[in-house]
């Protein structure tokens, strides 16, 4: 195989790029990302884009800084711009890999946004896809979870995974041909991580198979199955679009409403997918909830009303007519922030501050129950407000503007004690997940 030709063909799958596109490539120093960097550089000879190499120093291992410097030195030799981004933390406990992945995407996409870069290219290769398939299978994933996605958005940045049919072995061979050495991350071979356990499981599975059934053949068969699943998902997507248009409303105040009667007519897969997207949008998440958790809240299992469940940073409330999904802060309430154009509150609401003179020190916060008595009469006199037709509890998830700890504005219900605020400060709902299927009321 000619890996450079195959890679250029893969890049065509993502559609046409704009003239002289700005591209970022996530490169750790491992074989996958270094090979990706060289392949993109070759492809870019025709595209004439502007490439920036981004390396994350996680500060979890003593070698991490020298590894970032190694990537920088390679970039200098091949004349590519390189930037090291640092994950600043006070020590990590719990699921280190999950937290590192979340921080990594946050740092990468933040940089892309700040430098007007739309495309972020990452080294997710065929072996990763196969391992993810088994990991999700072990967790009981549904159709959407088992299918593979090589193009998606995080924080309005286009994530591209062009190595989807290229194996790790082929990437290493390519680096050897280019006389480039790579770094081996010891965590990739540690049995305390599920991915390593799955990798070993795949190898052990072959022992009981016929002698001519190789690891590579197994990977190809699994990828073929994933392709069929992805095709099946496309047919479900048409159903999803239909029900999103006719059954779902997402309000710019950050909550969603589903027509319960019509939603019952959707297939289970469509219901699970729609609920998953809504929970990510409302709950400020970039990753979907577990399939088993979705089953708990599906209409297939819950027929009663005047009840609620909590999941994925959301409260899912059931009335006779509707399913209402709104934010649950739990134990982690959003912090109070000074109003300015750089603020994104609760990872969902972007502040628009058009004040020419910021002499009034305003803060953005959530509505506390102790604040409610100050606006109770206004709320009760505005019962016709569409938001109050569903659940008054939603009010306590809206962003409010305070001055000296007093609520002076709740823009989403048009409450203002100061007209100058009404004319100058507002919020725009910008959730982490952006989907072509949803629009906001």
Swiss-Prot record:
Disulfide bonds: none
Record GO terms (molecular function): ATP binding; tRNA(Ile)-lysidine synthase activity
One Gene Ontology term from the biological process aspect of the record: tRNA modification
Key words, A-Z: ATP-binding, Cytoplasm, Ligase, Nucleotide-binding, tRNA processing
InterPro entries attached to this UniProt entry: Rossmann-like_a/b/a_fold, TilS/TtcA_N, tRNA_Ile_lys_synt, tRNA_Ile_lys_synt_N
UniProt binding sites for ATP: 28-33
GO cellular component, one term: cytoplasm
Organism this protein belongs to: Orientia tsutsugamushi (strain Ikeda) (Rickettsia tsutsugamushi)
Xref: HAMAP family: tRNA_Ile_lys_synt
Catalyzed reaction equations: cytidine(34) in tRNA(Ile2) + L-lysine + ATP = lysidine(34) in tRNA(Ile2) + AMP + diphosphate + H(+)
EC number of this enzyme: 6.3.4.19
Similarity comment text for this entry: Belongs to the tRNA(Ile)-lysidine synthase family.
Function of the molecule: Ligates lysine onto the cytidine present at position 34 of the AUA codon-specific tRNA(Ile) that contains the anticodon CAU, in an ATP-dependent manner. Cytidine is converted to lysidine, thus changing the amino acid specificity of the tRNA from methionine to isoleucine.
Name of the featured protein: tRNA(Ile)-lysidine synthase
